[in-house]
Amino acid sequence: MRFSLVLSLSAIVLSISICASSQTQFKQPTADELKMTSDPKAPGADAVYLNIEEISNDPLHYETFYARIKVLTEKGKDLATVEVPYLRGGFKVTDVAGRTIHADGQIIPLVGKPDDLLVSKKGDQEVGRKVFNLPSVEVGSILEYRYQIDHGEYYSSPEWEIQRSYFVHTAHYQFTPFKEFMPGAHGPTSMYMLDGRGRRVNSLIWWANLPEGKKLELNAGGYFSVDVTDVPPIPDEDYMPPIDSFLYKVSFYYKSAANAGDFWATEATQWSKDVDKFAEQSKTIREAVAGLIAPADTEEDKARKLYAAVQALDNTDYSRRKSGSELKQLKLKEARHAEDSWNQKSGDSEEIAMLYLAMARSAGLTAYAMKVVSRSRGIFDPSYMNLDQLDDTLVLLSIDGKPVLVDPGEKMCPFGAVSWRHSGAGGVRQSAEGPGYAVTPPQAYSDNATKRDASIAIDVRGHITGSLRIMTTGQRALKWRQRALRIDEAELKKEYDKSLEAIVPDGVEAHVDHFLGLSDPNAILMAVISLKGTVGTSTSKRLLLPAAFFESRQHTSFVSTEKRHESVDMGYPERLDESVSYHLPEGIAVEGAPKDSQVPWQGHAIYGFKTTTQPEALTVTRQIVTAFTLAKPQEYQDLRRFYQNVATADEQQLVLKISTAPEQLARGN
């Protein structure tokens, strides 16, 4: 975005002098800071921020950042590597300075220039990253650095990350915007801004989530500021929901709307027009659709055939996007319309989703686009007036009068299913009445099922050999199929074997022999696995085995962690069924087994355990259904109690009686 503002030479000189004087000077550390070995305000912390200062000035097109960090452990030394992302071609990272101060007061300055790395490139736009490493860092050191980003002819209103990965003692944030766009500003002005669509921008908007008792101050000098102290680090707990939407931060942006209602009415309408333009039903699309469907096809037949066709294309989010020169050599062009993606037989997830939208409409189906915030990243917040918070495009069909949500941009996702990231996700959607807010349906546990079926031969010493089949549908199957797109099958087997280590008992090796249904998203994915090793504890007369062959180690944190600050996010509900059959040799019989049991958590989850005894076999079946996705902190004790009861049930023992001496069995007597 550019300004129609021309600065005089004197203004340029003034700009340079103000920028130089705005740089924060390095501070003399106190004796307490130098000798600090731990921080009572942040027990166990690897490092803490002593100071942060971030100053942005849009009229002068610059921002500065300054930080002082106390390193308290070896891990804290990682903060000596500083990365500064920036947009090449318009922005410059300048005036980088830094130093390391040892606990004895010795100062080691930063020398040399930062490395300049290319992060990504799309078309003519390149994102770079300046990287520098503060020297001679030790546990106990203070790291101090600053840098400036010059915005050239662009403006870039700031986003302040008030809450960070480490405790912050004090921080100061300051932003000077264009006064012409301040609330209440009026009167004629020759200055204006254009957004990416060429529209005039006339309002400054901000979104703030601050610690209790703190507020964004508008100062008499025409700048905003926030001063904070003792900011806790970003929470870090197992199974946390994405918390980006809940962190302490402040975002500023210039927009043409003054309130959320006006903003989304305008932006959603423009988004819908852009979608329709890309998904235009051109001659190429109509001919392609005609070759894929038949006149006698039902609406569902058409929808499925077209879905299979776009899923078969090269999704460059899972492979590699062709460069501009490659497209030129192949006489292709950047995708601006659905027909471009079809001609290229490739596209990213967004392009493929909108290609499906175009083809569905061309086939006579009622189809609308919906764009949502990925649940792996955050939640949709209409009060945050920024269309960029939306991530992924889905397609909502009406088939025989019933709504069907599909996820064509999610490679290997079956028709009628969506990635867990897109279930229960909010955003905007098209409709016959025009665009508006919407939330996708949540998933059910029946959408995601795993069955483990093991057949095991065991001897009196607990040595086992056997086979295991793991059959999955839903999200776990989708995960492994997408992984198979990026690596070969040998590497996939290694990764799957690694995942098995978390569920089989210690002393047992599990190795994948082969997969079935790996390339067919509509099939059950099966992994055929060999088992060998030793389980249980053996004596001369008995063999003691764990009641549950498979362990739920992934949930042990719920058992051991007494308190919870954040919600528990399971990602998606699912059902797990297990059947383990032990084949017993002559001379071994079942002496004792746990009683059949159920552990319910009303409305949320249920656990079931059952044993079946036959003369030469013992079969243990186990089931866990988690019918919830999110548990609030006030529900944590109920959740913890459920998994404690599950752990107690799993830790029971199967008792096998040995009626013949092991030595005789070994000789076959």
What do the PLM-derived regions correspond to, one by one?
Residues 1-5:
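Positively charged n-region of N-terminal signal peptides that target proteins for export
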Residues 6-17:
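Bacterial N-terminal signal peptides
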Residues 22-669:
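A sensor for short, sequence-defined functional sites
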